[in-house]
From Swiss-Prot:
One of its GO terms (molecular function) is ion channel regulator activity. The lineage of its organism: Eukaryota, Metazoa, Spiralia, Lophotrochozoa, Mollusca. This is Conotoxin Cal22e. The cysteine framework is XXII (C-C-C-C-C-C-C-C). Contains 4 disulfide bonds.
Length: 53
């Protein structure tokens, strides 16, 4: 894979984590939230398989 960013991105807030709801997704029902390494100020949450968290 590509090298990880070498700077500390801010963590997603608890509210953003709570707002991510993947329960409607039968397979990818686990939330993974992270800041975009490209420098986006928005917290990006997406649904992943539980074992990929």
């Amino acid at each position: 894979g590509r090298p990880s960013a070498r700077y500390d991105a801010p963590y997603c807030s608890e509210e953003e984590l709570q707002a991510c709801d993947c329960s409607h997704n039968p397979v990818r029902d686990a939330c993974q939230c992270a800041y975009d390494p490209a420098g986006s100020p928005a917290c990006d949450c997406y649904c992943v398989e539980p074992w990929r968290r």
